[in-house]
Amino acid sequence: MALTLEALVARFGGEIVGDGRREVGGLAPLDQAGPQHLAFLANPKYLAQVETTAAGAVLIAPRDLEKLGAAANGRNFIITPNPYAYFARVAQMFIDLAAPQRAAGVHPSATIDPAAQVAASAVIGPHVSVEAGAVIGERVQLDANVFVGRGTRIGDDSHLYPNVTIYHGCTLGPRAIVHSGAVIGSDGFGFAPDFVGEGDARTGAWVKIPQVGGVKVGPDVEIGANTTIDRGAMADTVIDECVKIDNLVQIGHNCRIGAYTVIAGCAGIAGSTTIGKHCMIGGAVGVAGHVTLGDYVIVTAKSGVSKSLPKAGIYTSAFPAVEHGDWNKSAALVRNLDKLRDRIKALETALAAREGDAGGA
C-alpha cells in the first residue's frame, strides 16, 4: 500500500519540501532505495548518499538539509527533528498495514481453564495453555505453545510469540511484546546455606528459599527471545513502563528496572538490584546483586558493575580488543605491577633520603 507524503505528514507531523503528492510504499536505505521508497538520514556522515539516492523522498533533519544546499533541488524531503524515530514509526505503520488480520477466537487445540477470563477479541493460537484465574485482555495475541499460569494477567493489545512461558501470579501491562522462548516468573536463585564442618568433613545442604513474589511488567515493554525474568522472593520483581530488553538477558529476583531503560543482549542483572530510569546497559554487562544504578546511567558492553553507580554518566570496565601480541605484553606488565610498585617506593624513599642529606649539608 502506497501513501503520499502529505498523508504521512498528516499522521506523523513534519514539513514537506518538494512534491507532497509523491507516493511511497516502503522504506529502504539511502544507497538501496528506489523511487517507490522512503529513505532516511540519521547520521550526517552519510550526507553524500542523499545527493545520489534514487529514493522517492528522504526523512531529514533541518540542519542536514541546510548542509545539502543546491544538491537538495528537485528532491523530496520530510523535515523532522528526529528522522530515525520518524522512520521507526512509519516502518511500524507499513508492517501493520501489510500484516494479515487474524480472526479472534480460540484454536481447538488450546487448553483454557473454565476459571480463566479470555476477552472475545483475543487470538489464542494452537496448543496454548491458560490456567485458572488468568486474565487475557482485549486484542491479546497468544501464539502457538504459549503458557500462561494461574492468576496471571496479560494486558490489552499484548503479543506473546510462540513458546513464551509466563508463570503464575505475574502481570504484563498493555501492549507488551514478548518474544519466543522468554520465561517470566521462574523461581529466583535463592538458597540458604546449612553446612557444618570443614573440607571433606563438611556436611549439610543448600535449603531452597520459596519464591513467593511475582513479576510486574509495565505498559509498552518489549522482552527479547530467551530472556528470563525471575519472580521475587517475597516482593515482586518490577519492570517499569517502556523498558526494552534484548535477547538472552537474565534479570534476577527482586530487581527493579526503571522506566525507559534499555538492556542489550547477554546482560546479567543479579538479584535485588535497582536500575534507574533512562539507563542504557550494554551487551554482556554483568551487574552484581544489591546495588543501585541511578537515572541516566550508561554502562558500556562487557563491563562488570560491582558497586552502586548513583551518578548519571558513562561507565566502562571492559578491556577493548587489541592484537594478541600487544595483549600478552600488557598482561605481562599487569602481572608485575606489584614489583614495579615496590621498586618505585624504594626509589622514592632513596630520593627523599638523598634530598634530606643534601639539605642538611
UniProtKB/Swiss-Prot annotation:
The keyword Lipid biosynthesis applies. The active site is at 253 (proton acceptor). One of its GO terms (biological process) is lipid A biosynthetic process. Its EC number is 2.3.1.191. InterPro entries: Hexapep, Hexapep_transf_CS, LpxD, Trimer_LpxA-like_sf, UDP_GlcNAc_AcTrfase_non-rep. Pathway: Bacterial outer membrane biogenesis; LPS lipid A biosynthesis. It catalyses: a UDP-3-O-[(3R)-3-hydroxyacyl]-alpha-D-glucosamine + a (3R)-hydroxyacyl-[ACP] = a UDP-2-N,3-O-bis[(3R)-3-hydroxyacyl]-alpha-D-glucosamine + holo-[ACP] + H(+). It comes from the Bacteria. PROSITE patterns: HEXAPEP_TRANSFERASES (PS00101). Transmembrane segments: none annotated. One of its GO terms (cellular component) is membrane. GO terms for molecular function: N-acyltransferase activity. Disulfide bonds: none annotated. Keywords: Acyltransferase, Lipid A biosynthesis, Lipid biosynthesis, Lipid metabolism, Repeat, Transferase. Catalyzes the N-acylation of UDP-3-O-acylglucosamine using 3-hydroxyacyl-ACP as the acyl donor. Is involved in the biosynthesis of lipid A, a phosphorylated glycolipid that anchors the lipopolysaccharide to the outer membrane of the cell. PANTHER family: UDP-3-O-ACYLGLUCOSAMINE N-ACYLTRANSFERASE, UDP-3-O-ACYLGLUCOSAMINE N-ACYLTRANSFERASE 1, MITOCHONDRIAL-RELATED. Homotrimer. Belongs to the transferase hexapeptide repeat family. LpxD subfamily. This is UDP-3-O-acylglucosamine N-acyltransferase. It comes from Burkholderia thailandensis (strain ATCC 700388 / DSM 13276 / CCUG 48851 / CIP 106301 / E264). The lineage of its organism: Bacteria, Pseudomonadati, Pseudomonadota, Betaproteobacteria, Burkholderiales.
